[in-house]
């Protein structure tokens, strides 16, 4: 036997892997076990796996049955046990067996001995997971068989996995032969035995048997003991035998080292010798809940972590490129769940309910003031006061004044984070913090990193100090050099808060600051971002304080013998050596902090210095009195010479804390003179800060009594300054001074000084409010302004004694007294002074206290000013108060001049040598005047838009958007260099520029409208002026004559009437110019080969007035010339310019400007007269000539005839039938949207021979562009016309938006813009869209979707301006209307909500609710406007005249022609259309399904008899919030009246308060469940004139209505109810009655309904005669789903039914 075994050779493993596991590579051996060899390898995707190999040296032994059984067990627990890692692959060959599982770096054995060591909370969390894992395995019938610390895997976030299931190993082992145990179980050769004692049996009893759960429980108990003891394992093999035989091994004494008695008892029970006495894993979990394991493990943390980290994901690892997003989403999820005001389990676990009110200490910035903190966090004030009061009570301040707001100091902010928390907080932090730390180095977005750092601040409050420094700090330090400044700032604040709460340290952290923190923080001194340096300046004092604290703790450790000395020869404690080391460390620390502070004090940014000033107190404590005087004070004095008033203000705000440390002498020598001079600072905020500092220093008794008296004399006049803050601060100084004296001094010194300023005698001053009531009031602003003018304008004045031009040397400098007399004044020019303040004791010049008006000496000039002041209400006896303010007025004026001079000097330093050559040659670049046709430009810009133009995110100012952007011919322009010097092109002079640009108008009389136009467009770059494009413009080189009115600046102001971006702007009447005769225009039009040129109208663009152009008001012209031969152009490509160089930067810039201008161009064509502007003509029954057709005069009102004249059927909705119909603005054609993705434009054509015969012709059709890989087009779901133009926007089901300019007569269309709504799910289709014109003339599109998203798009750039989610609880959005100017949009939903959305700010402004589903909405025009007899050009969205389609002169009897040959145009009054669009009245059609049996209805089935659809229309004024009229049909009297009721929007901000139907939140599937009826109620407003057409009459709206599910249409006349009639059923009998008066509610009840009649004697022509056989049966009626009204040539009602058929009715 032995000889045979010795001849078997073990194969080479790399050969085995290459032959049998070719998908794995890069093997690394992880051990030389005798039983299973372990290798770490990688698969083809790069993921690490662990492979266990058993080499079968005896081929006759089959391993298939064993491996198959193991495979079944692993498949049973795969993805079902979160705490188990099964084998993902098993393979058996003739040579070996392979077990493959995912590789995890650490196991429990390694983690126990790795720093930072596990805390008790983390150990309990791991124990809980292992019990849960083994319980799940046992429940599935799987036992492990070999549980030990090496077979328990631990991730970086402390998630535990049971791995290496060993059910294939023998269950029982011989107790007299340890070789079997060593071969199968002791793979690490540690001689550790966790095998249950019952598994060791005599050799005679060895037999195969299954594993039992009790065996795993014993092994798990051994692992628990090893985890808690952290020393040696619980059992070796010999100790286990002794324990089994009741030998000398005392288990209880070993487990007594565990402090928790409950944990001891649990482990003793698990290690019971009798297997029957051991409980199941689930029983242990239930028994020790609340004792060993906290309840939060069961209720919250375990399930939350499973959903967060997806433990089963280890079996199917994510792609490497998804790792960052995976970790980022994990961080963001935790942040959203923990941060208040969430009310979920995790948030409640980590925060005591209602303790913080949404504010926590981690949100308190270290470098902001208290006011800024309160403004950002409205609820913070009460929270801060409550915490501050709590801390003060702990410190013994019981008599703290209630309601006061203490200033936040860094020490207070430190203490806020140290609030005690309960046990749940500790366990929550122990579980969640490792998850955050494990992902913090893998996230790549700024938001996720900042969220992670915020979570670290929250969770680290609940862990021990050692974990803060050993576990958390290294992870946060990695973000100190992040690329984002916000992340670096957050990391620095996190580190500061982390170390500031440490109270005890381990010996390893004794030199943390000197060796670790400060070397890494040093780079913040030179960070490029000033905010980062400012943050470090605010954190440095706290870090210095903690560094000193750590130094003291290290000294204590040395004295205790815990921390050894650096030198090895000092074996015993040497206190002298320890003291020396302490002083050396202290000196090194001070030198380091001093270097950092000196750098920050001299920083160039005032923000950095202000941040350091806000935290001076800790630095003064750190440095001591001497160092504070030498280092800090010497730098701070220079701050007062800075022009930044906020820096000076911060200096005086911090001076009180600094004065405590430098002492009274330094205050008297250095601080007091500076404060006195600051009393005349020109900035009121600085004066307020100085007065506040005076008050604080007086309260601290840092001034002598005589100094306080002098300060009081200076401050008293300031109570009259017209500034409430200064007055309040001055009163505070007076009150503090009064309280600092005893009673005798008050009566003898203070009261005489106060008495002149008091309006009545005051016995005692016990409050500021009382002092404010009795002291003189402030002077008015007008008086103060007059006083200032008096000083500035008076020449010979006795009132102003000192020379007004006196410089700063006029201030008396005296070392003997504080208030000295005026000395000899020396005149100096202000510009010669570089300093605002001096550093010596000073007194205000000419300071003389005046207590009565008689002491004043006034000249004649002074008397005039005094009389003016008297007339303003100032009593004569109080003029002395103004006299005491003379010094304040004079010195503030002088100081202000000095500061302004310094600011100007700083600017001049940038250009010290203005005449020095810069060696930069300015170059003027011209655009080539030869431009391609508009169609090619449109195609080119469309192709370039997605590739380049959309990637340019260039912000423009409002005025820049007003400049024309249409392609146009461009000539020379001026160029401004970087220093503001305007240069002219040398080769082209301004006098050489002349252009002739004409345009032929489309008006009937052939009148040509032309004008001048600015050919320049100011870009964002001030150095270059670029042309704005107009595709239809061209330079006429034959007749170089054109107007060129210029403004004072030499530039040209333009107004392009073809520009869609200038719709709402007004021309100044004097600036409108018309030139060139019609003959020249005709000639030029021929030379241009039919290209109509845009009229060039030069004017100033008014940015305030939004009215449209009413017409041409001036015909004056100015001419200039241009020599096109001098223009150098490039001929290589479309992006042509005069630039001939090859500089790639210049070329890229020109390409960017060209692409941006082309992308923003949207030529929607000329505007047309809207059809509602004319009366509704009657249908002609007799033959009339075409000429007579133009002279039709209406003699009576229109009424529907009830005749169907045509029908269009393209197949069912599945085959491409009609879904929606829209009429062009002038009713010359209509557009149908098909379910096959095709848009078709139709015209009505009638025969001249047979007037009563009519047919429809499809003039053009086009389909939406297919995306790559798509065979069929998506259905076109919605569309709209862009203003009164032929530009049509449509959207498909996948969110693709296209804008086409339709030319129906020529059967052409042009794609002018295209895009796609982002993040639109296929099931979230567009339900409504509406276009409107913005204030700058650009066209905007508002789209709402089924899932209640509102998308706001710029049609020209085709980019999303905003995309917001409406409240899902309101239901699905069904319709939207948009106001003129795109200020607001009104959205209707399926649950009856009217949401008024502010498009400017993207917020919900107001809401109303009505008990019905809102189906359609229309913005009604202003019907009060009357017709005018004056012809007018009504401007469209591009400000061009109305296009009147000329009539046809054909009289052939056999010819057919478009019906739009006769369109009567009724002009409106000036700007009538704009005023109409300004209306706020909306017609709302609604429907509701009444459920009599309270049963649900399947909308796909027929509506049962117990359900009835009720519908109606309500006219609602959005501005007033009032209902004007209501129309109801089949309305149940038991239903609530459908009148919109206002609902506050506050409920939308709180998730729990917004459950309309029930108390539960609703998801997307519940959007359409309340008021859904099978079919919508369709309506369309119709406008007609009352009475005869002659004269000035009013228009009135009629409403075309199709009730919900009805096949018939009805006309409702709210002005004459009896005139209401049916359109499609003339035999219908119905009644309509008024049931309410306020508002009027009309109810229609049908008594009889017949089927729609057949064609009334007229033939029914179709789209294609070949499709006649596909017509649906006439007797089969379908509900109406859409309607429209065609005004011309006479009234036609377009009806779309649910089958996809379109019918035309008169």
Swiss-Prot record:
UniProt cross-references to PANTHER family, sorted A to Z: PHOSPHOINOSITIDE 3-KINASE REGULATORY SUBUNIT 4
Gene3D superfamilies, A to Z: Leucine-rich Repeat Variant (1.25.10.10), Transferase(Phosphotransferase) domain 1 (1.10.510.10), YVTN repeat-like/Quinoprotein amine dehydrogenase (2.130.10.10)
Domain of life: Eukaryota
Active site (UniProt): 146
Gene Ontology MF: a single term: protein serine kinase activity
Known catalytic reactions: L-seryl-[protein] + ATP = O-phospho-L-seryl-[protein] + ADP + H(+); L-threonyl-[protein] + ATP = O-phospho-L-threonyl-[protein] + ADP + H(+)
Comp. bias intervals (Polar residues): 1029-1055, 1431-1442
Record's compositionally biased regions (Basic and acidic residues): 984-1002, 1014-1023, 1079-1090
Residue numbers bearing the Phosphotyrosine modification: 958
Function, as annotated: Functions as a part of the autophagy-specific VPS34 PI3-kinase complex I that plays a role in autophagosome assembly. This complex is essential to recruit the atg8-phosphatidylinositol conjugate and the atg12-atg5 conjugate to the pre-autophagosomal structure. Also functions as part of the VPS34 PI3-kinase complex II.
Modified residues (Phosphoserine): 957
UniProt lineage: Eukaryota, Fungi, Dikarya, Ascomycota, Taphrinomycotina
SUPFAM superfamilies: ARM repeat (SSF48371), Protein kinase-like (PK-like) (SSF56112), WD40 repeat-like (SSF50978)
The protein, known as: Serine/threonine-protein kinase vps15
Biased segments, Low complexity type: 1056-1069
Organism, as annotated: Schizosaccharomyces pombe (strain 972 / ATCC 24843) (Fission yeast)
PROSITE patterns: HEAT_REPEAT, PROTEIN_KINASE_DOM, PROTEIN_KINASE_ST
Quaternary data: Component of the autophagy-specific vps34 PI3-kinase complex I composed of vps15, atg6, pik3/vps34, atg14 and atg38. Also a component of the vps34 PI3-kinase complex II composed of atg6, pik3, vps15 and vps38.
Family to which the UniProt record says this protein belongs: Belongs to the protein kinase superfamily. Ser/Thr protein kinase family.
């Amino acid at each position: 036997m032995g000889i045979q075994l010795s001849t078997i050779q073990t194969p080479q493993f790399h050969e085995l892997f290459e032959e049998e596991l070719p998908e794995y590579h890069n093997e690394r051996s992880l051990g030389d076990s005798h039983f299973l060899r372990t290798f770490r390898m990688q698969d083809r995707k790069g993921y690490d796996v662990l492979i266990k190999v058993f080499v079968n040296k005896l081929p006759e032994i089959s391993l298939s049955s064993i491996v198959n059984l193991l495979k079944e067990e692993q498949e049973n627990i795969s993805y079902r046990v979160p705490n188990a890692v099964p084998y993902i692959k098993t393979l058996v060959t003739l040579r070996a067996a392979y077990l493959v599982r995912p590789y995890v770096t650490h196991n429990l054995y390694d983690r126990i001995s790795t720093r930072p060591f596990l805390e008790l909370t983390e150990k309990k969390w791991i124990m809980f997971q292992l019990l849960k894992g083994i319980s799940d395995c046992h429940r599935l019938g799987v036992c492990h068989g070999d549980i030990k610390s090496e077979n328990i895997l631990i991730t970086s976030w402390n998630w535990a996995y049971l791995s290496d299931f060993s059910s294939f190993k023998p269950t029982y082992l011989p107790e007299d032969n340890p070789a079997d145990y060593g071969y199968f179980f002791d793979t690490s050769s540690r001689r550790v035995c966790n095998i249950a004692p019952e598994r060791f049996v005599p050799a005679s009893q060895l037999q195969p048997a299954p594993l039992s759960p009790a065996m795993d429980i014993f092994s798990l108990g051994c692992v628990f003991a090893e985890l808690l003891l952290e020393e040696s394992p619980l059992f070796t093999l010999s100790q286990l035998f002794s324990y089994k035989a009741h030998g000398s091994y005392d288990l209880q004494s070993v487990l007594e080292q565990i402090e928790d008695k409950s944990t001891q008892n649990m482990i003793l029970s698990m290690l019971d010798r009798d297997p029957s006495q051991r409980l199941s894993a689930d029983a242990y979990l239930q028994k020790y809940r609340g004792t060993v394991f906290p309840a939060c493990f069961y209720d919250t943390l375990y399930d939350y972590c499973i959903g967060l980290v997806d433990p089963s994901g280890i079996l199917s690892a994510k792609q490497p490129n998804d790792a960052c997003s995976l970790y980022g989403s994990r961080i963001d999820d935790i942040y959203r769940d923990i941060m208040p005001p969430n009310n979920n389990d995790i948030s409640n676990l980590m925060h005591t309910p209602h303790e913080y009110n949404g504010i926590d200490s981690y949100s308190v910035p270290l470098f902001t003031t208290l006011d800024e903190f309160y403004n950002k966090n409205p609820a913070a004030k009460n929270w801060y006061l409550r915490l501050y009061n709590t801390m003060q009570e702990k410190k013994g301040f019981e008599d703290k004044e209630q309601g006061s707001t203490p200033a936040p100091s860094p020490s207070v902010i430190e203490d806020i984070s140290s609030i005690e928390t309960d046990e749940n907080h500790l366990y929550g932090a122990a579980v969640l913090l490792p998850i955050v730390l494990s992902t913090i180095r893998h996230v790549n977005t700024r938001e996720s990193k900042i969220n992670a750092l915020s979570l670290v601040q929250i969770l680290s409050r609940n862990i021990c100090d050692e974990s803060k420094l050993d576990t958390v700090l290294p992870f946060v330090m990695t973000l100190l050099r992040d690329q984002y400044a916000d992340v670096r700032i957050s990391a620095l604040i996190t580190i500061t808060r982390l170390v500031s709460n440490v109270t005890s340290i381990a010996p390893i952290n004794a030199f943390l600051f000197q060796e670790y923190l400060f070397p890494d923080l040093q780079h913040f001194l030179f960070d490029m971002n000033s905010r980062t340096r400012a943050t470090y300046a605010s954190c440095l004092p706290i870090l210095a304080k903690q560094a000193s604290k750590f130094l003291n703790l290290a000294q204590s450790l040395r004295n205790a013998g815990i921390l050894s000395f650096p030198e090895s020869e000092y074996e015993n404690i040497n206190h002298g050596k320890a003291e020396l080391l302490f002083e050396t460390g202290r000196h090194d620390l001070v030198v380091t902090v001093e270097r950092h502070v000196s750098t920050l004090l001299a920083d160039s940014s005032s923000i950095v210095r202000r941040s350091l000033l806000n935290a001076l107190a800790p630095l003064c404590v750190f440095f001591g009195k001497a160092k504070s005087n030498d280092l800090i004070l010497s730098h701070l004095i220079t701050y007062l010479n800075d022009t930044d008033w906020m820096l000076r203000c911060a200096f005086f705000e911090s001076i009180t804390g600094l004065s405590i440390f430098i002492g009274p002498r330094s205050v008297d020598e250095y601080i007091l003179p500076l404060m006195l001079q600051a009393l005349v600072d020109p900035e009121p905020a600085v004066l307020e800060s100085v007065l506040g500092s005076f008050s604080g220093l007086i309260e601290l008794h840092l001034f002598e009594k005589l100094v306080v008296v002098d300060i009081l004399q200076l401050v008293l006049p300031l109570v009259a300054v017209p500034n409430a803050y200064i007055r309040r601060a001055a009163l505070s100084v007076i009150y503090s001074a009064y309280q600092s004296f005893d009673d005798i001094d008050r009566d003898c010194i203070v009261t005489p000084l106060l008495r002149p300023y008091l309006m009545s005698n005051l016995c005692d001053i016990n409050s500021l409010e009382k002092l404010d009531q009795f002291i003189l009031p402030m002077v008015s602003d007008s008086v103060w302004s007059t006083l200032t003018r008096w000083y500035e304008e008076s020449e010979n004045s006795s009132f102003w004694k000192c020379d007004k031009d006196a410089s700063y040397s006029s201030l008396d400098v005296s070392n003997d007294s504080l208030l000295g007399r005026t000395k000899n004044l020396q005149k100096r020019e202000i510009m010669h002074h570089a300093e605002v303040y001096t550093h010596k004791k000073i007194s205000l010049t000419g300071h003389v206290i005046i207590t009565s008006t008689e002491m004043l000496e006034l000249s004649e000039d002074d008397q005039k000013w005094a009389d003016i002041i008297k007339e303003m209400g100032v009593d004569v006896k109080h003029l002395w108060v103004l006299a005491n303010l003379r010094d304040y007025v004079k010195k503030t004026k002088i100081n202000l001049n000095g500061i302004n001079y310094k600011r100007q000097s700083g600017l001049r330093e940038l250009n010290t040598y203005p005449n020095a050559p810069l060696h930069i040659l300015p170059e003027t670049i011209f655009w080539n005047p030869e431009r391609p046709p508009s169609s090619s430009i449109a195609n080119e810009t469309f192709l370039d838009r997605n590739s380049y133009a959309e990637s340019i995110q260039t912000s423009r100012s409002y005025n820049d958007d007003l400049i024309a952007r249409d392609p146009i011919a461009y000539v020379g322009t001026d160029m401004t260099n970087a220093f503001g010097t305007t240069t002219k092109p040398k080769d082209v002079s301004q006098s050489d520029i002349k252009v002739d640009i004409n345009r032929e108008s489309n008006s009937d009389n052939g009148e040509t409208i032309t004008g001048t136009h600015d050919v320049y467009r100011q870009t964002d770059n001030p150095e270059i002026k670029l042309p704005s494009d107009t595709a239809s413009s061209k330079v006429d080189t034959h007749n170089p004559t054109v107007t060129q009115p210029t403004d004072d600046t030499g530039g040209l102001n333009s107004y392009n009437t073809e520009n869609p971006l200038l719709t709402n702007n007004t021309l100044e009447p004097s600036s409108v110019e018309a030139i060139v005769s019609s003959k020249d225009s005709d000639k030029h039009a021929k030379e241009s080969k039919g290209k109509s040129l845009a009229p060039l109208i030069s004017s100033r663009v008014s940015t305030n007035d939004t009215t449209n152009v009413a017409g041409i008001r001036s015909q004056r012209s100015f001419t200039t010339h241009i020599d096109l031969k001098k223009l150098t152009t490039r001929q290589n490509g479309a992006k042509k310019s005069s630039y001939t160089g090859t500089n790639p930067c210049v070329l890229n810039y020109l390409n960017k400007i060209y692409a941006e201008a082309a992308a923003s161009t949207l030529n929607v064509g000329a505007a047309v007269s809207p059809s509602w502007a004319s009366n509704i003509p009657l249908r002609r029954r007799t033959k009339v000539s075409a000429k007579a057709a133009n002279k039709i005069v209406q003699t009576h009102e229109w009424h529907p005839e009830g005749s169907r004249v045509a029908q269009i059927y393209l197949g069912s909705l599945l085959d491409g039938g009609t879904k929606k119909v829209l009429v062009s603005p002038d009713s010359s054609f209509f557009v149908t949207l098909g379910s096959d993705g095709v848009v078709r434009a139709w015209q009505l054509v009638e025969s001249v021979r047979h007037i009563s015969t009519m047919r429809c012709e499809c003039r053009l059709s086009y389909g939406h562009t297919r995306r790559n890989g798509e065979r069929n087009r998506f259905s076109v779901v919605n569309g709209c016309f862009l203003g009164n133009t032929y530009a049509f926007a449509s959207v498909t089901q996948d969110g693709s938006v296209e804008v086409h300019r339709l030319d129906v007569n020529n059967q052409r269309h042009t794609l002018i813009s295209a895009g796609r709504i982002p993040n639109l799910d296929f099931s979230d289709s567009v339900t409504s869209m509406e276009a409107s014109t913005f204030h700058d003339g650009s066209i905007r599109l508002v789209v709402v979707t089924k899932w209640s998203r509102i998308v706001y798009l710029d049609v020209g750039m085709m980019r999303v301006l905003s995309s917001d989610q409406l409240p899902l609880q309101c239901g699905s959005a069904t319709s939207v209307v948009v106001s003129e100017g795109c200020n607001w949009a009104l959205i209707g939903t399926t649950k009856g909500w009217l949401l008024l959305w502010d498009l400017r700010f993207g917020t919900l402004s107001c809401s109303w609710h009505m008990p019905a589903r809102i189906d359609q909405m229309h913005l009604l025009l202003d019907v009060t406007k009357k017709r005018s007899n004056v012809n007018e050009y009504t401007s469209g969205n591009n400000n061009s005249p109305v296009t009147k389609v000329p009539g046809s002169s054909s009289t052939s009897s056999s010819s057919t022609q478009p019906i739009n040959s006769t369109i009567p145009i009724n002009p409106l009054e000036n700007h009538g259309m704009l005023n109409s669009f300004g209306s706020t009245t909306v017609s709302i059609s609604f429907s509701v399904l009444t459920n009599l049996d309270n049963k649900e209805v399947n909308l796909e089935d027929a509506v049962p008899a117990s359900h009835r659809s009720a519908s109606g229309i309500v006219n609602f004024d959005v501005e007033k919030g009032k209902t004007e009229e209501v129309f109801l049909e089949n309305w149940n009297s038991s239903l609530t009246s459908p009148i919109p009721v206002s609902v506050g929007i506050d409920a939308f901000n709180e998730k729990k308060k917004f459950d309309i139907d029930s108390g539960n939140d609703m998801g997307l599937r519940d959007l359409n469940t309340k008021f859904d009826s099978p079919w919508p109620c369709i309506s369309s407003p119709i406008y007609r004139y009352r009475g005869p057409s002659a004269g000035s009459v009013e228009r009135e709206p009629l409403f075309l209505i199709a009730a919900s599910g009805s096949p018939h249409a009805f006309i409702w006349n709210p002005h004459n109810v009896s005139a209401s009639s049916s359109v499609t059923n003339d035999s219908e009998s119905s009644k309509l009655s008024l049931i309410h008066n306020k508002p009027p509610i009309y109810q229609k009840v049908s008594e009889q309904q017949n089927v729609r009649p057949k064609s009334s004697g007229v033939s029914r022509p179709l789209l294609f005669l070949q499709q006649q056989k596909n017509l649906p049966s006439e007797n089969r009626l379908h509900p109406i789903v859409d309607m429209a009204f065609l005004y011309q040539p006479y009234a036609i009602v377009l009806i779309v039914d649910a089958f996809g058929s379109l019918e035309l009715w008169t």
